[in-house]
Amino acid sequence: MGKNILLLLLGLSFVIGFLQALRCLECDMLNSDGICEKGNSTCEAKEDQECGILVVSQGVDILFGMQDCSSHCLNKTFHHYNLTLDFTCCHDQSLCNEF
């Protein structure tokens, strides 16, 4: 009987852990040191969202970044003249879009 209760509790803990919502870091303006200067908070990703981060750089110098819950997230890097825009998405764990 004790084993059955233990297995039931273990199964429930897995279900509860699985059902926890994905939380993402949210920042409207990350400076070049990765410090949020505007809009520092977290957001709860909806069903069609994941955590996203955008880092804009020029050569090896990071200019600024942004973090959010994103519906249209892509893992892609774009080059435009001398600027690089690096979009990264994640959904494997909460707060995974850390700078």
UniProtKB/Swiss-Prot annotation:
Glycosylation sites: N40, N75, N82
Disulfide bonds: C24-C51, C27-C36, C43-C69, C73-C89, C90-C96
Entries under Pfam families matching the protein: UPAR_LY6
UniProt keyword terms in alphabetical order: Disulfide bond, Glycoprotein, Secreted, Signal
GO cellular component: extracellular region
Keyword Translocase: no
Signal peptide stretch: 1-21
Domain UPAR/Ly6: 22-99
Keyword flag Signal: yes
Location of the protein in the cell: Secreted
Family that this chain belongs to: Belongs to the PATE family.
Assembly and oligomerization: Monomer.
Name of the protein this chain belongs to: Prostate and testis expressed protein 14
Lineage of the species this protein comes from: Eukaryota, Metazoa, Chordata, Craniata, Vertebrata
Gene name of this polypeptide: Pate14
